[in-house]
UniProtKB/Swiss-Prot annotation:
It comes from the Bacteria. Its main location: cytoplasm. Homodimer; the beta-strands of each monomer intercalate to form a hydrophobic core, while the alpha-helices form wings that extend away from the core. PANTHER family: CARBON STORAGE REGULATOR. This is Translational regulator CsrA. A translational regulator that binds mRNA to regulate translation initiation and/or mRNA stability. Usually binds in the 5'-UTR at or near the Shine-Dalgarno sequence preventing ribosome-binding, thus repressing translation. Its main target seems to be the major flagellin gene, while its function is anatagonized by FliW. SUPFAM superfamilies: CsrA-like. Keywords: Bacterial flagellum biogenesis, Cytoplasm, Repressor, RNA-binding, Translation regulation. It is found in: Cytoplasm. Pfam families: CsrA. The keyword RNA-binding applies.
Length: 84
């Protein structure tokens, strides 16, 4: 792990297009800003772990083929009711 010392308003670059800015330091809390392209996901570690767990649960969910047919029929009915 790379460890860097930074002060308020100083930043760190990751690659060519991600910048981490130290916004504020108060006591034992450091506020950071992340400047990154919109296609780059940025999450706090604890939120990211929750997202991974939910994705894992969703992938393990068993869907019966008959249920897929029902969902397809509902979507077809919904689409046929739209005006173009």
């Amino acid at each position: 792990m790379l460890v860097l010392a930074r002060r308020t308003n100083e930043s760190i670059m990751i690659g060519d297009d991600i910048e981490i800015v130290i916004v504020d330091i108060k006591g034992d809390q450091v506020k950071i800003g992340v400047k990154a392209p919109r296609d780059v996901s940025v999450h706090r570690a604890e939120v990211y772990k929750d997202i991974q767990e939910e994705n894992k649960k969703a992938a393990e969910t068993k869907i019966k083929p008959a249920d897929l047919g029902k969902i397809g029929n509902i979507l077809k009915k919904k689409d046929s009711g739209k005006k173009e």
